[in-house]
């Protein structure tokens, strides 16, 4: 598969939605739908996709997740200083997000008909670790956490995590062909 455009400058629309990629835009080779939402206090958004798994990652703010018969109120100052909260659900499961303060979330979806148990990933489930320490004069060193991948959630067709580079270091990732090969082969 040939990759098309790999970088752009998306912006939020007047409803607080920023589209990063869809199945049919210029980044369609990613085979995912990824969007970021800015929410005001009291705002409610619902996410439910048939034939797709969905992950809702808190980037910053204070909000309440509601899914199936469960509720969890979570908060995160920002992606740089506090751990991540993420709900991951299979096809057809509704996730309701209520912003208790100004909140920003990332919603990532991909096609997947497999049914699996919904899971709320807490900060302690995906601790930060360092990658590429000492490589390339140590300019590739970065903090990474894997929220889920094929090893953590074998039923998933997605990988979700965060990467933080130290100032002045390269942005990007060294290719891990094993993980990405597994994802592409599904």
Task: Describe each PLM feature range.
Residues 12-46, 134-178:
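A short glycine-rich, His/Asp/Glu-containing loop-to-beta-strand
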Residues 48-49, 69-77, 119-123:
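Short amphipathic beta-strand/extended segments with alternating polar/hydrophobic composition
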Residues 103-143:
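Double-stranded beta-helix
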């Amino acid at each position: 598969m040939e990759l098309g455009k790999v970088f752009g400058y998306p912006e939020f629309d007047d409803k607080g939605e920023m589209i990063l990629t869809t199945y049919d835009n210029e980044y369609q080779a990613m085979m995912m739908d990824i969007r970021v939402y800015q929410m005001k206090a009291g705002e409610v958004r619902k996410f439910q996709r048939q034939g797709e798994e969905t992950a809702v990652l808190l980037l910053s703010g204070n909000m309440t997740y509601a899914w199936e018969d469960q509720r969890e109120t979570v908060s995160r100052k920002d992606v740089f200083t506090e751990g991540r909260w993420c709900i991951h659900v299979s096809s057809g499961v509704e996730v309701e997000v209520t912003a208790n303060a100004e909140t920003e979330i990332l919603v990532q979806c991909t096609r997947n008909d497999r049914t699996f148990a919904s899971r709320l990933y807490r900060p302690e489930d995906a601790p930060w670790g360092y990658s590429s320490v000492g490589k390339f004069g140590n300019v590739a060193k970065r903090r990474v956490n894997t929220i889920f991948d094929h090893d953590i959630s074998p039923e998933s067709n997605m990988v979700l995590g965060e990467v933080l580079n130290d100032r002045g270091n390269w942005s990007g990732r060294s290719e891990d062909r094993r993980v990405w090969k597994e994802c592409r082969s599904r």
